[in-house]
């Protein structure tokens, strides 16, 4: 088996359920390793510019970005905990010493409710589509990762988008599940099903190009590294390196879409909190024009290094743990098949005698 073909594996080599288990494990490990970096970043931001009530900020668990709405000053929330930090390392050490190591994962559990299922759907769909497209595309099979990545991202975003909308609305308006269901029914009655996918378009503008480029570069990079180091199967180091490089390239190219989407999400969340019309900033195009007018074209590339530092390790950890999980299940299946074959030989030999 060539290294480039090793990601999806041949039919029957690894089951979709095992792919789901591998991606679920990868998602949890990624969030546990990446979240502390974002928690420290948010604590440093809150120290420099305290978050007022209704202010929104972006929380990243390494899998998805989540818009969080600040609660009032009387509530003891993790991002308003007292502390004076001189830098990132100092913040890490003081948070662990003063608040306990668990504080580095503050706010993580609620975000995993959507992030883990979205990741499982995304990675499993990609592998299934990649295997199918490689067979169907023939001489153009090199482009299979491009199309498989784009389609898989559309699918996962479509499934998760209504849940993200509901989560943000519940947090910003402090509604119960019963009140929320009434709001949803009213929205469906007045605006139709489209109301549940508000913000879906801007999400796809960033995530679909990112996904297509990421998988295309990842498969190419993995194949090249395997060839370079004469590996028949990709090692953890190879998948980690290919994931980091492909994630970096995709994040740089799609940065303007990320800037626009994040600004739009934050503005929409704050307008919802203040009970103002969300139509003020509903257009992606208008947000982009406003950014250029206020900060020039360079404004669309704001946060270049923070995004790179966030995306590269997250992509590397996720893909390497996912590939490791698939390799584990592949080996398990082969051993099981070998044992079954050996048992059949023993039985047939016994019957002959």
Curated annotation (Swiss-Prot):
PROSITE patterns: SOLCAR
Keywords: Membrane, Mitochondrion, Mitochondrion inner membrane, Repeat, Transmembrane, Transmembrane helix, Transport
GO cellular-component term (any): mitochondrion
Chief site of localization: mitochondrion
Any Gene Ontology biological process: import into the mitochondrion
Catalytic activity: glutathione(in) = glutathione(out)
Disulfide bonds: none
Placement of Solcar repeats on the sequence: 14-132, 140-224, 234-328
Gene Ontology molecular function, alphabetical: glutathione transmembrane transporter activity
Gene3D superfamilies cross-referenced by the UniProt entry: Mitochondrial carrier domain
PANTHER family assigned: FI19922P1-RELATED, MITOCHONDRIAL GLUTATHIONE TRANSPORTER SLC25A40-RELATED
Function: Probable mitochondrial transporter required for glutathione import into mitochondria. Glutathione, which plays key roles in oxidative metabolism, is produced exclusively in the cytosol and is imported in many organelles. Mitochondrial glutathione is required for the activity and stability of proteins containing iron-sulfur clusters.
Family membership noted in the UniProt record: Belongs to the mitochondrial carrier (TC 2.A.29) family.
Protein name: Mitochondrial glutathione transporter SLC25A40
Organism name: Danio rerio (Zebrafish)
Lineage: Eukaryota, Metazoa, Chordata, Craniata, Vertebrata
């Amino acid at each position: 088996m060539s290294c480039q073909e090793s990601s999806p594996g041949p039919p029957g080599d690894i089951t979709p359920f095992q792919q789901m288990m591998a991606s679920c494990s990868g998602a949890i490990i990624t969030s546990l390793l990446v979240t502390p970096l974002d928690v420290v970043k948010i604590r440093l931001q809150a120290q420099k510019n305290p978050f007022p009530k209704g202010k929104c900020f972006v929380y990243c668990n390494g899998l998805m970005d989540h818009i969080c709405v600040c609660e009032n000053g009387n509530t003891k929330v993790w991002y308003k905990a007292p502390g004076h930090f001189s830098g990132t390392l100092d913040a890490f050490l003081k948070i662990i010493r003063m608040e306990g190591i668990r504080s580095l994962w503050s706010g993580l559990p609620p975000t995993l409710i959507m992030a883990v299922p979205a990741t499982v759907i995304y990675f499993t769909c990609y592998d299934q589509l990649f295997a199918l497209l490689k067979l169907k595309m023939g001489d153009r099979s090199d482009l299979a990762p491009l199309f498989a990545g784009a389609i898989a991202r559309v699918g996962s975003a479509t499934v998760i988008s209504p849940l993200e909308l509901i989560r943000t609305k519940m947090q910003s308006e402090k509604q119960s599940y019963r009140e929320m269901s009434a709001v949803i029914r009213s929205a469906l009655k007045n605006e139709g099903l489209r109301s549940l996918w508000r913000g879906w378009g801007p999400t796809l503008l960033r995530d679909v190009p990112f996904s297509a480029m990421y998988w295309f570069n990842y498969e190419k990079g993995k194949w090249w590294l395997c060839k370079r180091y004469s590996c028949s199967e990709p090692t953890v180091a190879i998948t980690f390196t290919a994931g980091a490089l492909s994630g970096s390239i995709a994040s740089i190219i799609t940065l303007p879409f990320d800037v626009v989407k994040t600004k739009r999400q934050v503005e929409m969340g704050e307008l919802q909190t203040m009970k103002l019309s969300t139509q003020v900033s509903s257009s992606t195009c208008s947000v982009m024009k406003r950014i250029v007018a206020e900060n020039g074209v360079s404004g669309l590339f704001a946060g270049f290094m923070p995004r790179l530092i966030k995306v590269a390790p997250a992509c590397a950890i996720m893909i390497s743990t996912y590939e490791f999980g698939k390799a584990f299940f592949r080996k398990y299946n082969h051993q099981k098949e070998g044992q079954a074959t050996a048992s059949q030989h023993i039985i047939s030999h016994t019957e002959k005698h």
